[in-house]
Swiss-Prot record:
Residues 210-465 form the Protein kinase domain. Keywords: ANK repeat, Cell adhesion, Cell membrane, Cytoplasm, Membrane, Repeat. GO terms for biological process: cell differentiation; cell-matrix adhesion; embryo development ending in birth or egg hatching; integrin-mediated signaling pathway; mitochondrion organization; muscle cell cellular homeostasis; myofibril assembly; positive regulation of establishment of protein localization. PROSITE patterns: ANK_REP_REGION, ANK_REPEAT, PROTEIN_KINASE_DOM. It comes from Caenorhabditis elegans. This is Integrin-linked protein kinase homolog pat-4. Changing residue 257 to L: Restores the interaction with unc-112 when mutated at 'Asp-382' and the localization of mutated unc-112 to integrin adhesion sites in body wall muscles. InterPro entries: Ankyrin_rpt, Ankyrin_rpt-contain_sf, Kinase-like_dom_sf, PK_ILK, Prot_kinase_dom, Ser-Thr/Tyr_kinase_cat_dom, Ser/Thr_Kinases-Pseudokinases. It is a peripheral membrane protein. Interacts (via protein kinase domain) with unc-112 (via N-terminus). Interacts (via ANK repeats) with unc-97 (via first LIM domain). Interacts (via protein kinase domain) with pat-6 (via C-terminus CH domain). May form a complex with unc-112, unc-97 and pat-6. Does not interact with integrin pat-3. Component of an integrin containing attachment complex, composed of at least pat-2, pat-3, pat-4, pat-6, unc-52, unc-97 and unc-112. Disruption phenotype: Embryonic lethality due to 1.5 fold stage-onset paralysis. Mutant embryos have defects in maintaining polarization of several components involved in the assembly of dense bodies and M lines, such as integrin pat-3, unc-89 and unc-112 to muscle attachment sites. RNAi-mediated knockdown causes sterility resulting from oocyte accumulation in the proximal gonad and distal tip cell (DTC) migration defects (33 percent of animals). Actin cytoskeleton in the proximal gonad appears disorganized. It is found in: Cytoplasm, Myofibril, Sarcomere, M line; Basal cell membrane. The lineage of its organism: Eukaryota, Metazoa, Ecdysozoa, Nematoda, Chromadorea. The gene is pat-4.
């Protein structure tokens, strides 16, 4: 019997493997943590009974190597525990400067407040961590924000470093006398709790446990609903299958676990599924900005300049590189802006919930504009999937740089036929940067064997950001 099938007597719903990983992080056992993370079904953003994430414990314990490992694999920097502490609160309060610096470099919210109204700077000042206070102030931490008791970081500061911290604040243009009263923002729902561990432990769920609130969309694939499950915001996809036979139900049960990929920051995993014919439901985390297609082409508050466009492209390339490293590979994830989601930190993630099952839409292509000529004329089993995905990525690059929908003037069938048989291609307009123009052309090489792989283009995109 495997470890994952043993359960604690005092917590019958908590597998030993989950309990162990929190212990390994607290102990600083980097080797065991790495082994646990290498299983892509393990969700590194889960919380324990008090909603402490693995990153919370690494930050509190000062385990730099583990913190680096978690951050590199997509740990959510601004997740909060039950007391509304972020990992930055804990690192600052316990004097772990290396981790503070790493969290700040990952866009940690420097002025986040916990249930007491305390910011990370409050704790750095209270414990006299002068260098950490300077790091925080340099990144925008405010010295004049009051906690629930009306006290600023300088009010609670250790006398020995108060004058130094005051000078640092003044050098950064802050006026400590302009006190900012405490404002309770918890009602706004802006805080991001760690995921309940049950979200990544459950694979099969009962449809009746889903509270589906609002229908977001309906298409040939099925219905998309926003709702709640276990108190968490989720999106449920109810698949459109004419008749759910015993074989289809069995195939669904066999195929969906491969979509539970938690091990990469640029992949949005399937959390669970409900297999209750006639209902087949896929459950994933709700993303506030929706799909990249929505961000680019529909009403969205996101401002996309050239730098943000390249960052989106880099996120997508990193996610695709990881997918291409899997053995066996996913056969039916069709890359397009409709199948990429954007989280609250403007990180692009490949949506595993948009992967097609073997029984879905067989022989049909509803978004051919992003597909390579060979993908439109061959079955996935007979295709060089890596090369076909690179063509799709080139169309995404074109879309990010032009802000246009490819072949929007053509119906899908005509578009697909012309791409496959008549040489229809996107036109790269003048004004696109020369290096981006060249990258698009390389990725869209007519010879699939001459297209690069994602590991080769990631360094190119990284240089474009610098």
């Amino acid at each position: 019997m495997s470890l994952s099938t043993h359960y604690h007597a005092h917590k019958p719903n908590v597998p030993i493997i989950m309990e162990d990983v929190f212990g390994w992080v607290r102990e600083g056992n980097a080797f065991q943590v790495r082994v646990w993370l290498d299983d892509h079904e393990h969700d590194l953003n889960v919380g324990d009974d008090h909603a402490f994430s693995l990153l919370h414990w690494a930050a509190k314990g000062g385990h730099v190597a583990i913190a680096e490992m978690l951050l590199s694999r997509g740990a959510r920097v601004n997740s909060t525990n039950m007391g509304d502490d972020t990992s930055l609160h804990l690192a600052a309060a316990h004097g772990h400067r290396q981790i503070v610096v790493k969290l700040l470099s990952r866009k940690a919210d420097v002025n986040a407040t916990n249930e007491h109204g305390m910011t990370p700077l409050h704790y750095a000042c209270f414990w006299g961590y002068e260098q950490i206070a300077e790091d925080l102030i340099s990144c925008g931490a405010a010295v004049n924000v009051c906690n629930k008791k009306g006290m600023t970081p300088l009010d609670v500061c250790q006398p020995m470093c108060k004058n130094t911290i005051l000078e640092i604040a003044q050098e950064h243009g802050q006026s400590p006398n302009d006190r900012v009263p405490f404002k309770d923002t918890t009602w706004k729902g802006t805080k991001s709790r760690t995921r309940d561990a049950t979200l990544s432990r459950y694979t099969g769920v009962d449809v009746s446990s889903l509270n589906l609130i609002t229908k977001i969309a309906e298409s040939h694939s099925g219905e998309l609903w926003r709702g709640k499950w276990q108190g968490n915001d989720i999106v449920a996809r109810i698949l459109n299958v004419q008749e759910v036979t015993a074989r289809i139900s069995r195939d669904f049960q066999t195929e969906f676990p491969a979509l539970r990929i938690f091990a990469h920051p640029n992949i949005c995993a399937v959390l669970a599924a409900a297999n209750q014919p006639p209902n087949l439901v896929i459950i994933s985390q709700y993303m506030p900005f929706g799909s990249l297609y929505n961000v680019l082409h529909e009403q969205s508050s996101v401002v996309i300049d050239h730098g943000q466009a390249v960052r989106f492209a880099l996120d997508i390339a990193r996610g695709m590189s990881y997918l291409h490293s899997l053995d066996p590979m996913l056969l039916r994830f069709y890359l397009s802006s409709k199948h990429v989601v954007v989280d609250e930190e403007l990180t692009a993630k490949l949506s595993m919930a948009d992967t097609k099952f073997s029984f879905q839409e067989v022989g049909k292509a509803y978004s051919p504009a992003w597909m390579s000529p060979e993908a439109l004329s061959r079955a996935p089993e007979d295709l060089n999937i890596r090369a076909a995905d690179m063509w799709s990525f080139a169309i995404l690059l074109w879309e990010l740089n032009t802000r246009e929908v490819p072949f929007s003037d053509l119906p899908p069938m005509e578009c697909g036929m012309k791409i496959a048989l008549e040489g229809l291609r996107v036109h790269i307009p003048p004004g696109i940067a020369r290096n981006m123009n060249r990258l698009m052309n390389i990725c869209m090489n007519e010879d699939p064997g001459r297209r690069p792989n994602f590991d080769q283009i990631i360094p190119i995109l990284e240089r474009m950001i610098l």
